[in-house]
Each structure stands twice: as C-alpha cells, then as structure tokens.
C-alpha cells in the first residue's frame, strides 16, 4: 500500500526538500494538505477506468508512478503539483518515507505538522536515491570533466544531492508548482470550503481529463452547501487544519464517482450534438460564410445559457445531496474501495440501474427527428419501464434522450430542415403577391428581328445626353425636364408612356393633324427617338478604338437578326434527325470571329449587352450563372447539370406561378467558350460562365428589379438543396451562390448569348457565349428540334422585357407578380444570420434608418450631400496619406452615384464630364482611366455604420475585375 501526500510549505519548497535530502534539519515545517491510498498491485484499482470521463489505469505496475517496483512495505510519497500535466498525472513525488515509522494517518487526524527531524527519521533513502539517480541521468547526459569521468557516481543519497544541489533545485523549481501561501490555492481551486476540498482532491489526486473549471462546476452540481468562505485563512497551518477537519473529505470518494459519471454524461451529450450538427451539414450545401455562422448558431442554441442551466440541474445531485450525506460520512481515500451503497445511490441519480450497463453508440444520434411528448425536454423512451418511479423514469429518459441535442433539434435543426428542404421551403417561407387583370396593364418591348430596314439609335453616353438635352429644349413646357446625365434617364424615357396633347390649329382643315404636321398626342420617347412608338431594348456595345475600350449605347427596335449575325447558314446545317442533346450541340457549329470591328454596325453583332429597365415588366428569366469549380468538368457532367438545373427552375416556377408543361416549356443554355486541349470538353479550371434563359409561364410577368432579385435569391437557395443536384455539385462546385442577382438593377447590363468579351489590351474577342441545347421531350420528334434550335438562337427570346407571341392566353387573366418574399429572412439578413441575431439578441437595423439619423444630426437632407461632406473627407485624407500624389490628386473633385444604394459609385469630374479613375495599386503600362471605385455602407448597430472603399480594375495584375478593398472607416453617432 502506498500513500500519496500533497504537501506545502511557507518557504521555498525546493530548498527545503533538498536540505532534507542532504540530512540537514531546517526550521521550516511541511504541511500535509491531502492524501490518498493507492494499491499499485491491484488490477481492479479503477472500476470506472473504462469510462470516457476517466483514464483506465488498471495496470499500475507498468505506470510511471510504479517505476520503483511497488514496495514490499507501505510507503509514503510526498508529492508536489507538477507544472505540466503529462498523461493526466498532476502530482509527482519528491521524496519517500517509511509508512510504519511515520504513522502518517494518525498525525493527519490530529492536525500535526511534519518537522524536518521527524521526516529525516522516516526517510526512505533507497527509493529516494533511485528516483534522483534517474532524474540526474535524464538531466546530465554525459560527464563533462575528466574528474567526473574518473570519480564514480555517489552511492549515498546525501552525497548525490549535495554534489548536485544546484541542478536539483533548478529541476524542482522548473517542474513543480510550490505555493507558499493559502491564497494561491484559494484563487485557483475555489474560495469556499466545498469547492476547494472537492476540486483539489479530484483534480490533483485522480487521473482524469477534467480541467479545474470543469471540476469546480461538478462540485457545484454535487452539493448545494458550499461550506464556509476561506477569506480569513492566512497561514498555511490554518489552511491545513481547515482541510483536514473539513466534512467534505468524507464525500471525496462519492464525488469522484459522480464526476466520472457526469463527465461521461457530458461527453455523450457533446458527441450527440456534434453528430446532429454534422448530419445536417452533410445534407445541405452552404457557403463558407454560412458554414461559419451556422456553427455559431448551432452550438449557441445547443449550449444556450437557459438550456445548459436546465441540463445542469437535471444532472446534478443537489436535490439528493442532503439525504445521502450521512451515508458517506467517513473519509475514504482509497478510490478502489468506494462504498457500494454510495456508488449505487449515485447510479440511481445519474444513470438508472437498468441503464448502467448499456453501451451508447454514436449511431443513435442521427438526424432523424425525435418525437417529443414534453416541452421540458424530458420525453419518454420505450426502453423505460412505465411501472418505475417517476424520478427513475425521468432520469432514464434524460440519459437516453440526449437532452441538449434533443433541444437543438427541436429549437433549430428541425426548423432548419424545413428551410433547407425545397418543398417545405416553398410552401412555408416563400410568399408571392400577385395582381390579376383581364387585360394588359403594362407593355414590354415591341421589336422586329426580321426587318430588312433597321431602326437603330446609337451613340456614346455623351451623345445620348445631348439627345436628352435637345428633347428638353424642343418641347419645353409639355413634359417635365429629364435629367440628361446617365443612361438610366434614357431607360426611363424608353419606358415612359406619358403623352402630351398638342393644341389644334383652327385654320387647319386636316383631320387629326396640327399645322406642324405632328400628331395631336405625342410621347416624349418619340421626341428623343423619332419613330419609336413603343419601348425597345437599349444595348451596350464594347468597341476597341485607339488601343482602348470604347462603350456605345444603341436603342434597336428593328433589325435583321439572323442575316446580320450570320446565323442563317447555321440554321441550314442543323441535322434532320434528333439523336441527343450532346450530338445536337456538337453539330450546330457557329462561325467564330476573333477580332473587334471598328464599325459599330458590325460590332453590334459581336459585343452586345442588354440593359435592365426597372420600369418595364419582365417576361423572361435571364440568369447569369458563374460556377466556381475545382477543375475542368466533363461533357456528361455539364449536360447533367443543365438538365437538373432546367428541372429545378421549372419546378420552382410551377410552384410560384402557374402550371408548366415540362415537355414543352423551353429553357435555353449558353456556355462561355474556351479552348479545350487534347479533345476535352471544357478547359475552364476555375469558373464556368453560363447564361440560362426561359420565359415565365403564360400570362405571368414580374414587375420590378427587386422582385427579380428575390426570385434569383430563391433559386440560388433551392438549387443545391435538390438531392440530385447536391450529389452532382458537392465536390465540383465551390460556391453555391452561382446566380448573380446584381444584373436586375436599373441600368445594369448583362452580356447576350452569342456575344463575346472584348480584350482590354488588344481588342480580341473571347469567351463567346455558345449554345448548349437541352431539347424538351415534345421537340425531339418530327423534326421539331429545328424549331427549338431556331428559337434558342433568336434574340427576341433572350431579352428581359420582350414577351413572346404565346406569352398571353386571352381566355385567362394576367398575373402581375408584385413581390416574391422569403419570410424566413429579415430584410437584407439571411435566414441563418437572422436566427443568429435573435440568439445574440442583436437587433437588425436597416442602413436607411441609420442614415436618416446621421442626416438629421448633421442637418442634411440629401444622401449624396451627406456622403460628400461627412463620409468622403475621411477617405480622402487616408488616400492622400497612404498613396502617391498622382493617385490621390484624381480624387480631389468627385461626384457620387447612389443609384445602387447602399453601394455608391464614385466618378471624378473632368472638364464637366464624369470619368472613372486610374488604378491606385499598380502603375499599369497603359494607365487608362477604366477603374471603377465604390463606397459600401453597412450597419453595425443603431448608431454605427461602416463604410468601405473598394475598386475594380480590369487588368490582370489586379485580378481582372476582382473586388479590391482599400480602406474602411467607422462612423458613430455620439449619444
């Protein structure tokens, strides 16, 4: 039998121990704090060693503490706390004494301090000498001097310690914690008697993985009586007597058993929480940001304060502690001999007898919903005997139900499952607001794509502004003056249906004509663009002149599309028989053009972008898809992705709008061209660009770009929730938000199919959007696939605001979709962030609300003026301080375009015109002014906003149009 004794001194323990080992009596005493009996040869010394809360040390003969070959007679190990915790050993011996000579337990009960003379009489020099020889052999590897090599190692303990005193003092100081005041013990282990005694005993004398904080928590769960406070305990002797006389020493064996069971219970809960969270994560595709936020949300919900306190009470012994105090009132220090009566009491409280021997596998914690019959979280289990007492049944259900993980599923994961399941998401969270009308209330484009004579109005942004100014002067007084700056004003005029009535001249005999020959009713659109009686698309064309990109804007109402775009021969080469989508795509060969044309009439059919008009109804869904992939994809993968995407879009439209014939409804796909090598299908290794276009169901159109953005966000959310799509893209696609909803802002443009990008350096055409045919079932027979190919190559089917000939059924009412809302979101906050804000009790404040507070504080009415006077000066100072003068000077005279608020674009004013900037990060070879700068506004709280300055440079050195963030500033309203 061995007794481990934790002692302390009021002086430097290292020097006291070394002096004792040298045989020198010192004036300082040793204060035994705690002790424990250990039988190194008993293989059943730790009956609970197999539990995860403790370490299984059944074979202590092979343990490091038994390195001196378990003694024949009883031995006392005088130990100190180690600096490091290796293999969960927190105390190690510094010397040994003979137990029969010291009679330690009698001295402990009488609160006797141990003087140096007493210890010298009982010192076990043999075992102590063996221990320090081993220590010195590890510290001193080889003899350094010739004299050390000649002289043999001392065989006497006193000689050994004397000749290596400095080395051993340093060793003890570096490897052991040697407090000299009770204040250290009180600050670390607790300021109350129960916390200190129970925590010290379990943490220092039991080999387990729990930290001090965890053990203190267990002590609070173990007893409600924390004993007396220790603030008046100053001397080490008083501290020793307090511990030795504490009634809580009689509960250490019971507390040890409770801690191991509680530790195992906590571990099972955490494993169940992990399994539930991982099971959910493996079945949904989240972005990186959503993954991080979901982890915070899940663990914050599972371990919320109220739930954790409730769980703590359910697994504590507070209600049973007082009844069982007298059962274990003897101080039992041998953990191997825990009284069976005490152990059974704890088993009945923490784990019922019927559950004690059960093995709980992780597979029990799956993501299947648990049927709860109680709102408290303790729900019945079939394995519990109904005839058992209410307390036993509750504890049985508590242990088997995994209380915390059950509440996690109940309060979050089951709700998340509804939101991340396509059908339930569309049924519960998506609300569509429609207006039904028997007759058309709005009109879209009216274009003719087969006209031999074209109607095209083209020019630069400057010439378009001149048109507006001339129109304002020409009929001043008939219409309100239109802002002549920006292409958005041109779009507003194109969409306007407001007419003015011209006064009739009395001398005019002609019917319906004025003297000027103008009609009596005239629209402002016809003034600016003569002959344009109905809305028409406005395109942006990128040209290349004088080694730089030039942008032109064209309003086209009539053109011969197939002839001018050289697609007539393509249609003639379509095979007569349909074989497969892959074969049809390969057989339709489109002639390639690599160089920009200096003539706008030709360049219009090589580079064309449609500009979104927020004032016109939307008849076609035009999706701009950017697939961020891990590497090149195969042909089979690409076509499988398109077919699955087609099905998901049609199912979504069918649920939101009207019934759709999946075998008839067209969905057009166009993929950005690349140059594959070695016969591969695609060479895109980082990003695949797609254009997905499909008309809305008949008699359905959407009003407003905001509604289109919401629809795009819904499709983004649903897309990767589909099981077939998820298995297809889980490894291949990096980011799930592949649909760009920024193209649905007023004045934003999207590149049309069959069009190319213009290289900014040499003007070459690249990444042309080429057709990829996914033919509906009804078009696959009787040569109808030719009709589908012609429709897919017809520009009239690609435009946002152009209704097809079959868009309306006169026998049915027309549905104008006014809004499509995801009620699971809070304004601009995602579903997960909304839940996280509620968990953190963080109230979301819209940016417009905060801006109004700032404007009222500074007595400013216009947002642009607020940006110019309050926000921008901070950025200007930062730019001038951190960038070279040439870069900073171009920001001296700027203006702001808040059309896409809260993203504000900057322009510099040069000779009365708005222009972009030069790059401030690098000195590019051409140094052109084509860099766009923006200010992003984001709310942090009800009184704070963050503003970020970022830019997009088109050069490769700046990552080709990637977002480059420069600086952020914080603006706060002082309360």
From Swiss-Prot:
Function: Essential component of the helicase/primase complex. Unwinds the DNA at the replication forks and generates single-stranded DNA for both leading and lagging strand synthesis. The primase initiates primer synthesis and thereby produces large amount of short RNA primers on the lagging strand that the polymerase elongates using dNTPs.
Source taxonomy: Viruses, Duplodnaviria, Heunggongvirae, Peploviricota, Herviviricetes
Name of the protein described by the UniProt record: DNA primase
GO molecular function: ATP binding; DNA-directed RNA polymerase activity; helicase activity; hydrolase activity; zinc ion binding
Predominant cellular place of this UniProt entry's protein: host cell
Localisation per UniProt entry: Host nucleus
Class of enzymatic activity (EC top level): transferase
Residue intervals of every CHC2-type zinc finger in the record: 919-958
Family the UniProt entry places it in: Belongs to the herpesviridae DNA primase family.
BP terms from Gene Ontology: bidirectional double-stranded viral DNA replication; DNA replication
Any Pfam family matching the protein: Herpes_UL52
Subunit structure, as described in the record: Associates with the helicase and the primase-associated factor to form the helicase-primase factor.
Keywords associated with the record: ATP-binding, DNA replication, Helicase, Host nucleus, Hydrolase, Metal-binding, Nucleotide-binding, Transferase, Zinc, Zinc-finger
Disulfide bridge map: none
EC number: 2.7.7.-
Site features described as Essential for primase activity, chain residue numbers: 624, 626
Cellular component GO terms held in the UniProt record: host cell nucleus
């Amino acid at each position: 039998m061995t007794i481990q004794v934790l002692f302390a001194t009021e002086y430097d323990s290292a020097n006291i121990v070394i002096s004792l080992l040298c045989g020198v009596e010192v004036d300082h005493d040793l204060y035994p704090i705690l002790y424990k009996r250990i039988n190194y040869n008993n293989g059943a010394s730790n009956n609970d060693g197999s539990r995860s809360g403790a370490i299984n040390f059944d074979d202590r003969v092979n343990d490091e503490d038994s390195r001196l070959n378990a003694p024949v007679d009883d031995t006392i190990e005088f130990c100190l706390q180690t600096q490091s915790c290796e293999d969960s050993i927190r105390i190690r011996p510094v010397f040994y004494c003979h137990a029969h000579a010291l009679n330690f337990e009698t001295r402990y009960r009488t609160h006797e301090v141990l003087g140096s003379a007493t210890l010298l009489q009982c010192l076990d020099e043999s075992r102590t000498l063996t221990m320090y020889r081993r220590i010195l052999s590890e510290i001193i590897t080889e003899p350094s001097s010739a004299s050390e090599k000649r002289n043999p190692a001392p065989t006497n303990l006193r000689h050994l310690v004397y000749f290596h005193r400095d080395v051993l003092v340093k060793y003890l100081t570096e490897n052991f914690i040697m407090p000299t005041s009770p204040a250290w013990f009180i600050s670390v282990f607790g300021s109350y008697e129960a916390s200190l005694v129970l925590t010290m005993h379990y943490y220092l004398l039991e080999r387990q993985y729990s930290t001090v904080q965890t053990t203190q928590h267990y002590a609070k769960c173990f007893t409600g009586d924390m004993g007396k406070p220790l603030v008046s305990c100053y001397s080490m002797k008083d501290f020793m007597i307090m511990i030795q006389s504490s009634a809580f020493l009689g509960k250490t064996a019971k507390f040890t058993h409770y801690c191991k069971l509680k530790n195992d219970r906590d571990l099972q809960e955490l494993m169940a929480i992990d399994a539930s969270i991982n099971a959910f994560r493996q079945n949904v595709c989240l972005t990186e940001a959503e993954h991080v936020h979901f982890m915070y949300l899940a663990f914050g919900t599972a371990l919320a304060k109220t739930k954790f306190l409730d769980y703590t009470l359910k697994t504590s012994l507070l209600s049973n502690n007082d009844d069982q105090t007298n059962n274990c009132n003897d101080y039992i220090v041998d953990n191997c001999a825990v009284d069976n009566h005490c152990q059974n009491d704890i088993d009945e409280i923490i784990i019922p007898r019927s559950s004690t021997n059960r093995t709980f596998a992780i597979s029990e914690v799956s993501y299947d919903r648990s049927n709860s019959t109680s709102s408290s979280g303790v729900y019945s289990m079939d394995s519990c005997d109904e005839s058992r007492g209410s307390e036993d049944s509750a504890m049985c259900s508590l242990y088997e139900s995994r209380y915390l993980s059950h509440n996690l599923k109940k309060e979050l994961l089951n709700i998340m499952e509804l939101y991340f399941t396509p059908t339930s998401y569309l049924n519960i969270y998506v609300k569509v607001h429609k207006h039904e009308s028997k007759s058309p209330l709005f009109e879209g484009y009216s274009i003719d794509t087969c006209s031999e004579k074209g109607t095209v109005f083209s020019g630069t942004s400057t010439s378009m502004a001149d048109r507006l100014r001339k129109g304002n002067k020409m009929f001043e007084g008939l219409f309100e003056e239109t802002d002549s700056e920006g292409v958005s004003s041109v779009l507003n005029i194109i969409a306007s249906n407001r007419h003015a009535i011209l006064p009739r001249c009395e001398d005019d005999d002609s019917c319906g004509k004025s003297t000027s020959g103008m009609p009596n009713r005239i629209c402002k659109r016809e003034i600016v663009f003569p002959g344009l009686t109905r809305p028409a698309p406005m395109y942006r064309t990128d040209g290349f002149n004088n080694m730089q990109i030039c942008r032109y804007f064209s309003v086209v109402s009539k053109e011969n599309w197939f002839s001018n775009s050289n697609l007539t021969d393509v249609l003639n080469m379509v095979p007569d028989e349909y074989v497969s989508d892959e074969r049809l795509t390969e057989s339709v060969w489109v002639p390639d053009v690599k160089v920009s044309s200096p003539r706008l009439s030709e360049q219009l059919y090589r580079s064309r972008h449609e500009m979104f008009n927020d004032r016109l109804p939307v008849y076609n869904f035009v999706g701009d898809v950017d697939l961020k992939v891990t590497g090149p994809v195969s042909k089979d993968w690409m076509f499988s992705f398109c077919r699955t995407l087609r099905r998901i879009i049609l199912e979504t439209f069918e649920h939101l709008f009207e019934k759709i014939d999946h075998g008839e409804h067209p969905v057009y796909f166009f993929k950005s061209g690349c140059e594959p090598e070695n016969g591969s299908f695609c060479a895109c290794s980082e990003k695949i660009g797609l254009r997905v276009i499909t008309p809305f169901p008949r008699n359905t159109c959407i009003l407003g770009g905001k509604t289109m953005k919401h629809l795009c966000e819904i499709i983004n959310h649903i897309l990767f929730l589909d099981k077939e799509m998820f298995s297809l893209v889980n490894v291949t696609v990096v980011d799930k938000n592949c649909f760009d909803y920024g193209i649905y802002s007023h004045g934003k443009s999207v590149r049309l199919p069959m069009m190319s990008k213009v290289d900014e350096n040499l003007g070459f055409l690249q990444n042309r959007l080429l057709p990829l045919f996914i033919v509906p079932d009804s078009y696959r027979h009787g040569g109808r696939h030719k009709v589908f190919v012609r429709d897919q190559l017809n520009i009239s089917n690609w435009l946002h605001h152009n209704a097809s000939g079959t868009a309306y059924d006169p026998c049915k009412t027309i549905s104008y979709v006014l809004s499509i809302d995801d009620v699971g979101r809070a304004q601009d906050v995602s579903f997960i962030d909304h839940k996280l804000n509620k968990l953190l009790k963080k109230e979301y404040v819209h940016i417009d609300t905060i801006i109004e507070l700032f404007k009222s504080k500074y007595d400013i009415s216009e947002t642009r003026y607020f940006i110019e006077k309050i926000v921008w000066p901070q950025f200007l100072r930062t730019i001038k301080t951190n960038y070279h003068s040439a870069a900073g000077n171009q920001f001296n005279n700027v203006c702001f375009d808040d059309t896409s608020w809260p993203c504000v674009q900057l322009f510099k004013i040069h000779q009365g015109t708005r222009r972009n900037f030069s790059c401030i990060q690098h000195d590019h070879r051409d140094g052109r002014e084509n860099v766009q700068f923006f200010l992003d506004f984001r709310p942090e709280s009800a009184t704070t906003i963050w503003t970020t300055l970022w830019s997009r440079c088109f050069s490769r050195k700046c990552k080709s149009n990637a977002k480059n963030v420069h600086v952020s500033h914080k603006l706060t309203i002082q309360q």
